[in-house]
Amino acid sequence: MNKKSPDTEKVSNYDYLEKMNTFELLSNINKEDHTIAENVKKQIPSIEKLVDEIIPRIDSGGRLFYIGAGTSGRLGVLDASECPPTFGVSPGIVIGLIAGGDTALRNAVENAEDDTNQAWKDLQEYDISEKDVLVGIAASGTTPYVIGGIKDARNNGIITGCITCSSGSPLAEASEYPIEVVTGPEFVTGSTRMKAGTAQKLVLNMISTSVMIKLGRVKGNKMVDMQLSNDKLVGRGIRMIMEDLNIEKEQAEKLLLEHKSVRKVLDAHKNERN
């Protein structure tokens, strides 16, 4: 029986791309991009199920792992790396792994994604356990590295989810909580760094942001736990304090310098009022 080809490998709706002028190229790429958010919207119920599994596990000391290869792996590493500065969590709470290791973040590592056993070896270096959650990311849903990792994790009692852009894929079938954002043919046939990659980034944003909000890492709409690692973020923290406490800039600067954290400033002020 012939296996179904991934949706991400379907032939582009456009042809003779090299004959288009620059405006036509940009307009057609943009036209395709307009379809992405609506396709993500269709998967909100599936995203919700996965998020609601992640929250209690991190709250109980567990972690969230992402695994992927190529663009998918890079997006997982990107999302994981943004959680500490944005939400003030330890770098070990959300962990992104890419087939081929950190070298693959900049340069393709030949055949790295074809090893079905390597992901589990990589995960074991972090002592992954049933307290954690593993999310596999693969546009086609056929990447051996990711499928192997998901299957091994599930066999060891670990909650698994996935983000894929092809329906009925082996990865989705292997995962307990599949998210299938079917983005259709790419503008450049098979170039999943385009629509599929954008869709995956949107879903990752939704997962990590909603998890951190539900874990109390946002107050109102503000990143009160963000790391004050540069002048821009210090300025943002000062503005948050000014707005929340209705005070002048000089006083806000003094409080932030004293407490080193927006949350600590706001909590201290709250305790004073009580």
Swiss-Prot record:
Gene3D superfamilies: 1.10.8.1080, Glucose-6-phosphate isomerase like protein, domain 1
The reaction(s) this protein catalyses: N-acetyl-D-muramate 6-phosphate + H2O = N-acetyl-D-glucosamine 6-phosphate + (R)-lactate
UniProt keyword annotation of Lyase present: yes
GO function term, MF aspect, one: carbon-oxygen lyase activity
InterPro entries: Etherase_MurQ, Glucokinase_regulatory_CS, MURQ/GCKR, SIS_dom, SIS_dom_sf
EC numbers on record: 4.2.1.126
List of catalytic residues: 82, 113
Alphabetical keyword list: Carbohydrate metabolism, Lyase
Superkingdom classification of source: Bacteria
The keyword Transcription regulation is annotated on this UniProt entry: no
One BP annotation, GO: peptidoglycan turnover
Pathway info: Amino-sugar metabolism; N-acetylmuramate degradation
PROSITE patterns: GCKR (PS01272), SIS (PS51464)
SIS domain segment(s): 54-217
Oligomer and partners: Homodimer.
HAMAP family reported in the protein's UniProt record: MurQ
Additional observations: A lyase-type mechanism (elimination/hydration) is suggested for the cleavage of the lactyl ether bond of MurNAc 6-phosphate, with the formation of an alpha,beta-unsaturated aldehyde intermediate with (E)-stereochemistry, followed by the syn addition of water to give product.
Family that this chain belongs to: Belongs to the GCKR-like family. MurNAc-6-P etherase subfamily.
Database matches in NCBIfam families: N-acetylmuramic acid 6-phosphate etherase (TIGR00274), PRK05441.1 (NF003915), PRK12570.1 (NF009222)
Function recorded in the entry: Specifically catalyzes the cleavage of the D-lactyl ether substituent of MurNAc 6-phosphate, producing GlcNAc 6-phosphate and D-lactate.
Name of the featured protein: N-acetylmuramic acid 6-phosphate etherase
Lineage: Bacteria, Pseudomonadati, Bacteroidota, Flavobacteriia, Flavobacteriales
